[in-house]
């Protein structure tokens, strides 16, 4: 809830303690992270059983080689040119790195950074693949909303943070409600599908807004978009956690976040490229249309307007067909708020038109993600933890029973595992992370 507001406050500050304001958006996470680390260390007490394992150094190295060049070209591609030698080199290195990563992971087995075996599960493969696509459209669309509020409606960074609270509220409500419903029903599949559908609807409606749209209507659409976000992100992660082998729980959870963030990074880069590649032409078209507007024409010769140096410099550049006036605005959009509203309106129309295109592309990408998620099988949440499931399954195998156990049978296996683990060190069933290994190493009687 506080994130957009605090971020807006820092972004709007020139300097805090001698440090540029926007840098505090990152620095503030340091003390917050330290406090969170302290709380976790003091309150979270989970039994740890050390197991010998190899570190997948080659997997980590090839993943970095594959991802970093792609992130670099995503960040710099608009400046370099998407088909420039620098970009093509980054593409080649990135693809080669990812191919090498897959080759390494298939040979590392259980020690792999991301074991390839998890992709054999249809639910995991679809959740991760859909997460990449949805993340691309989701983060791309989210990025444009504050730009619309600040450039088109003239909001300060902090004001735009307040205006985005409906989206945060929608996320909170949807997260809580979907969490309660998933707990009661044990079903997950429907929630990300509904969530992405809501995002598609919200983005389609956002693609219809203009420079003159009522901010209250825009905030209502942000709330709808937030409802979609709240129904999507956590359920997709839960779907992966529900079906993955307990020993792969941490890896699969981090992989789900990683894939979604990677999709978001690429989406942001592509959508920003679309925005700024189209905005110049849209602004020029808006000024051509404004030349037929009597109020705009009157402002060009209004002495009160020309008394402002910013207005006068812009009108002079416009009358001499100096295109640098447009470039200055693209380099620093805050100039728009310094202009007379009649002179600034074509700029806002041009930006709004380009943003509409980005919202539309976001809706199309999210719709593609929705199509992928439709193929995800139903996932049923378990009332037992991953540790308990692993222990019960191991106990069933030790007792000569195939598969997971329930009911009275589960009571017997609990007693059996407790007896064996007590002999091994006094740990109870719920403390046992992977009882299967204990039975594999103990001789059968």
Task: Please name every model-derived segment.
Residues 1, 5, 64, 172-173, ...:
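Hydrophobic/small/kink-forming positions within alpha-helical transmembrane segments
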Residues 1-59, 85, 169:
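Helix-loop-helix hairpins in multi-pass membrane proteins, especially solute transporters
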Residues 2, 12-15, 141, 147, ...:
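Small-residue-rich alpha-helical segments with characteristic i,i+4
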Residues 8-21, 77-81, 151, 156, ...:
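Extracellular/lumenal inter-transmembrane loop segments of multi-pass membrane transporters
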Residues 30-48, 64-76, 94-108, 369-378:
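C-terminal membrane-cytosol helix-exit motif in multi-pass small-molecule transporters
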Residues 31, 58, 72, 80-251, ...:
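Transmembrane core module of solute transporters
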Residues 35, 39-42, 83, 103, ...:
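Transmembrane-helix exit segments and adjacent C-terminal regions of multi-pass membrane proteins
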Residues 49-53, 110-117, 283-289, 379-391:
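Short, Lys/Arg-enriched, Gly/Pro-containing loop segments at transmembrane-helix junctions
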């Amino acid at each position: 809830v506080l994130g957009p507001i605090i971020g807006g406050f820092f972004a709007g500050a020139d300097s805090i303690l001698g440090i540029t304001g926007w840098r505090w958006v990152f620095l503030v996470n340091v003390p917050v992270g330290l406090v969170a680390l302290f709380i976790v260390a003091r309150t979270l007490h989970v039994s740890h059983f050390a197991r010998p394992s190899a570190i997948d150094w080659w997997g980590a190295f090839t993943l970095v080689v594959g991802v970093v060049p792609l992130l670099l070209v995503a960040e710099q591609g608009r400046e370099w040119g998407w088909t420039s030698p620098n970009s093509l080199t980054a593409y080649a290195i990135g693809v080669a790195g990812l191919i090498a990563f897959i080759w390494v992971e298939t040979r590392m087995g259980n020690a792999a950074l991301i074991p390839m075996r998890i992709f054999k599960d249809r639910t995991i493969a679809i959740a991760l693949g859909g997460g990449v696509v949805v993340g691309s459209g989701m983060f791309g669309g989210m990025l444009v909303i504050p730009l619309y509020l600040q450039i088109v409606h003239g909001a300060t960074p902090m004001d735009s943070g307040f205006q985005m609270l409906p989206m945060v509220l929608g996320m909170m409500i949807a997260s809580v409600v979907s969490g309660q419903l998933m707990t009661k029903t044990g079903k997950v599949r429907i929630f990300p599908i509904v969530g992405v559908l809501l995002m598609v609807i919200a983005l389609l409606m956002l693609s219809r807004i203009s420079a003159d749209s009522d901010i209250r209507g825009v905030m209502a659409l942000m709330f709808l978009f937030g409802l979609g976000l709240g129904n999507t992100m956590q359920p997709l992660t839960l779907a992966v956690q529900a079906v993955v082998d307990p020993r792969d729980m941490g890896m699969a959870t981090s992989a789900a976040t990683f894939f979604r963030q990677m999709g978001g990074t690429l989406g942001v880069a592509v959508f920003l490229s679309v925005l700024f590649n189209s905005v110049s032409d849209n602004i020029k078209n808006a000024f051509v249309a404004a030349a037929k507007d009597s109020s705009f024409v009157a402002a060009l010769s209004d002495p009160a307007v020309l008394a402002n140096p910013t207005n006068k410099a812009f009108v002079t550049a416009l009358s001499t067909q100096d295109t640098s006036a447009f470039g200055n605005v693209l380099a620093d959009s805050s100039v728009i708020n310094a202009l007379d509203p009649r002179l600034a309106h074509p700029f806002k129309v041009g930006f709004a038109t380009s943003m509409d295109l980005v919202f539309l592309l976001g809706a199309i990408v999210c719709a593609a993600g929705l199509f992928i998620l439709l193929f995800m099988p139903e996932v049923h949440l378990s009332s037992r933890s991953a540790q308990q499931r692993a222990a019960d399954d191991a106990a069933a195998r030790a007792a000569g029973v195939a598969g997971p156990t329930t009911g009275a049978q589960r009571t017997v296996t609990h007693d059996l595992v407790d007896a064996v683990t007590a002999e091994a060190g006094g740990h109870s069933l719920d403390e046992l992370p992977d009882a299967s290994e204990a039975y594999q190493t103990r001789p059968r009687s």
